């Protein structure tokens, strides 16, 4: 008998073989087949960093959402291991799409790829019943024809001006991209991580600003933010800390998130 023997394993791929996540594709109206996200009316009460466990726990019990305004290496695993990291997103129940970076000197193919990955993660999470809000990111005007693909019109969109330096060129590019977002997608609400700067004279829709990690640490949160965020969250202490001052052994204790938060340099990516 000639030929190659069959194997039950030939119909499946070995682990980590599908690094492009081609096992799952989603509907798209984009020329680059960047997945389309469904609109949502969900507005998170707060934003929790992907790599901050205590913040994630607080967001899970307070109507918050995960954010990815971090260095890219800290959340690369949401793309490289989407199924393995899905429970972390499900535990909170809502998330912004990953903010994979776009740089001015980035090759166009790499920029399209990062936009694709961001929307793909959002579409995958939506398919698993998670509330997803798109994060808009752009670089130079030649990215405008694809960087907003997949964002629904008239929806809530997350942005941040944190990475903008004092350079007038950077500020002008941010303003140009924001105006393009408004013209193309007409968002009904902008969620801004940190103060939304450099656009006070623009005709913006409603804007909801969220304090950053350092806003909280440096006590620079405005009175309005302080009133919206209660300082004490209903999150139990870890087992080794279960007996807090003034509490009997076994009695429930509460965590002051501002005091207990771990510094970002100590919180690595998974």
Curated annotation (Swiss-Prot):
Query: Which residue ranges are recorded for the region named Disordered?
Result: 225-249
User: Which InterPro entries does the UniProt record give?
Assistant: DUF4417 (IPR025530)
Q: Which Pfam families match?
A: DUF4417
* Superkingdom to which the source organism belongs: Viruses
What protein name applies here? Gene 1 protein
């Amino acid at each position: 008998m000639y030929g190659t023997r069959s194997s039950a394993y030939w119909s499946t791929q070995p682990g980590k073989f599908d690094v492009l996540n081609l096992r799952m594709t989603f509907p798209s109206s984009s020329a680059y087949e960047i997945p389309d996200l469904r609109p949502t009316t969900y507005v998170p009460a707060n934003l929790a960093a992907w790599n901050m466990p205590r913040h994630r726990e607080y967001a899970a019990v307070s109507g918050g959402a995960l954010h990815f305004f971090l260095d890219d290496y800290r959340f690369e695993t949401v793309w490289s291991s989407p199924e393995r990291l899905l429970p972390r997103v499900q535990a909170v129940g809502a998330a912004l799409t990953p903010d994979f970076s776009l740089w001015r000197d980035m090759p166009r193919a790499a920029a399209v790829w990062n936009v694709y990955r961001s929307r793909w993660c959002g579409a995958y999470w939506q398919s698993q019943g998670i509330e997803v809000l798109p994060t808009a990111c752009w670089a130079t005007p030649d990215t405008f024809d694809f960087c907003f693909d997949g964002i629904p019109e008239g929806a809530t969109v997350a942005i941040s001006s944190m990475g903008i330096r004092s350079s007038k060129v950077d500020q002008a590019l941010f303003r140009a991209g924001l105006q393009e977002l408004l013209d193309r997608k007409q968002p009904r609400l902008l969620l801004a991580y940190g103060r939304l700067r450099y656009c006070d004279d623009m005709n913006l829709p409603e804007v909801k600003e969220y304090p950053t990690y350092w806003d909280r640490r440096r006590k620079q949160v405005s009175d309005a933010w302080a009133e919206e965020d209660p300082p004490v969250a209903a999150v139990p202490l870890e087992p080794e800390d279960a007996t807090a001052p003034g509490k009997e052994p076994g009695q429930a204790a509460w965590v002051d998130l501002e005091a207990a938060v771990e510094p970002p340099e100590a919180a690595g990516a998974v």
